[in-house]
């Protein structure tokens, strides 16, 4: 198993399959990626994951951009599944109604679907497109095939902070888990007008959940708390993702990232931590060479939010 200098095991690999997306969400961080021209093939992704699995990485999440716009998405899933115990996908849901059954057959274990609002006008304002109805259909289809389905809601001040309870009800109706996510930016953007305008702190809401929940669990990943809250006769599972200045969140991160153009990346918010793995692979690197590249990347890992930065 890979363990960094801070004693944190690395068990998860988050792979961006593309920087492209069929929506244009105004807050999107693009998985912390910069522009690049390289493009990983299914064979190259498979080899990297095969090597990662030898190092104890058994959970892989496919992201983007929007990963399902890759025409070879089913091939990628089929290639990766033999090497991992948990293969998941984060998607905007626009293709889910059409692809859900094929994704399941290819070997996908579970899905996270982005859904920031249930209001058509707001959805178009946030994403630039009027496709909310298709996404809702896709969510309902996904919940019949996958468990759990998680709905990712980035909570933004003055945009959708008035919809949290409605989203909880919807999650209960479709038997999904709701993830409430704080808007996240790097340190240099904390004083930006964008952050001041849209950041909505989730700590007060989490304190309210503590009182309302019939049960509370804590995940190993980031020590995120999961609240089981009664609403309209159902128990809805709500997970709060609160990363800004959260030292506990960082100290319990078990992720490594692979960018769409083939760089290992140790942290979403860092841009000084890229380690090229695709270049050496294309230049004939052996599996032993690729293992050393993984080890080098893990040595670079350090918590973004610390007691000195919080």
Curated annotation (Swiss-Prot):
Annotated positions binding [4Fe-4S] cluster 2: 250, 253, 267
InterPro entries the UniProt entry points to: Aldolase_TIM, Elp3/MiaA/NifB-like_rSAM, MoaA_arc, MoaA_NifB_PqqE_Fe-S-bd_CS, MoaA_twitch, MoCo_biosynth_MoaA/MoaC, rSAM
EC assignment: 4.1.99.22
Binding site for GTP: 14, 61, 90, 150, 255-257
Cofactor notes: Binds 2 [4Fe-4S] clusters. Binds 1 [4Fe-4S] cluster coordinated with 3 cysteines and an exchangeable S-adenosyl-L-methionine and 1 [4Fe-4S] cluster coordinated with 3 cysteines and the GTP-derived substrate.
UniProt family annotation: Belongs to the radical SAM superfamily. MoaA family.
Name of this chain's protein: Probable GTP 3',8-cyclase
